[in-house]
Regions:
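Secondary-structure boundary/capping motif
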Residues: 34, 57-58
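Short, proline-enriched alpha-helix->beta-strand connector loops that line the catalytic pocket
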Residues: 41-46, 72-75
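Short beta-strand/loop motif that positions the catalytic acidic residue
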Residues: 48-50
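Primarily recognizes the serine-hydrolase "nucleophile elbow" in alpha/beta-hydrolase
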Residues: 1-43
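Short alpha-helix in the alpha/beta-hydrolase fold that links the catalytic acid
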Residues: 58-68
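Acidic catalytic loop of the alpha/beta-hydrolase fold
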Residues: 53-57, 86
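C-terminal catalytic histidine-bearing segment of alpha/beta-hydrolase fold enzymes
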Residues: 70-117
Length: 117
């Protein structure tokens, strides 16, 4: 499952809910979760592609995510894209970053090649 923005949040929530998918990709999605939810097992591969200048992903959100991924024994990775804002992959956005968008897509294809083999 691949999702951008709100869809990226949905992709991560799919992993959190342990739906039977081989892997999820969250591209500039929301990474936080309600603090009342406990961390549980994560049974799918997870790729998170995050713009470095996304104000919605604070250091605390990232710290909580790392803790959640590790406690859930997930096969996970986060790639952070320099000089990129929230909509860095959208060619119609003033924040579009062509170089980083191409890298994100390359990383997505590499991940899918591993997950779907």
């Amino acid at each position: 499952m691949i999702g951008y923005c709100f869809g990226g949040t949905g992709a991560l929530e799919t992993a959190r809910a342990n739906f039977p998918v081989k892997g999820v990709v969250s591209i500039h999605g929301g990474l936080g979760k309600d603090s009342t939810r406990t961390n549980g097992a994560l049974n799918t591969k997870i790729l998170i592609e995050n713009p470095a200048e996304d104000g919605g992903v604070t250091p605390q959100v990232m710290s909580n995510l790392v803790k959640e991924m590790n406690e859930g024994k997930a096969d996970w990775q986060v790639i952070t894209y320099a000089y990129s804002k929230h909509t860095f992959t959208d060619p119609k956005s003033p924040d579009y970053n062509e170089v980083m968008a191409k890298r994100a897509w390359s990383h997505t294809l590499l991940f899918l090649g591993e997950v779907l083999k």
